[in-house]
Amino acid sequence: SSFRIMRQVLDRLEDSATGRLLPQSFHCEVPAERLAQAQATAAILGEEVYRRFPWAHYDCGGSTQFALPTTTDPLQALLKRTWEPTLSVTGAEGFPALQDAGNVLRPYTAFKLSLRLPPLVDAAQAVQELKTLLEDNAPYQARVTFDGGGGATGWNAPATTPWFEQALNEASQAHFGASCGYIGQGGTIPLMNMLSEG
């Protein structure tokens, strides 16, 4: 089936048991300053890093069960937000609506993929690598096509200057009674790169 072929092709990209993207070129080393900031923020926020999200839940025999995050380690949760690549399927074609589905083979399966990359990974190069990974040597000589549809490299803030870090900490201490914490946000905002270039 075309869906099984799609699963096999996506298995080249992602470990479905862990969600880890397999191409090493889609990963990068976390800069030392960002790692230190994440460690400090994880110590401040603890479990609130992931508990504050409205996790999906269902009622099972009177006891409410909640979906769990992929990690309950506060530091890892912060790093996964920005410094680990992530695959999401954001759309699908070739599937009838449930009420119209029958016991037939469908002629094709199409997915729209969203790939979030760490800010130090070149997006244009990653798109080309992804195209090769998905299209080459398709199972059963099936025709697999990938249209990159664009992409932009993320942004990593320049190193924090001592005077700015001191000003942030003083303001945070005055208002919150604690040192400043830093949280990176995954997702590309191309404007940030343009602004940083002047």
Which residue ranges define each predicted feature?
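Alpha-helical metal-binding/catalytic segments enriched in His/Glu/Asp
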Residues: 1-17, 113
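An extended, acidic, His-containing surface patch that forms the Zn2+-binding/catalytic region
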Residues: 19-108, 116-129, 137, 141-198
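Generic solvent-exposed, charged/amphipathic alpha-helical segments
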Residues: 7, 11, 131-135, 169
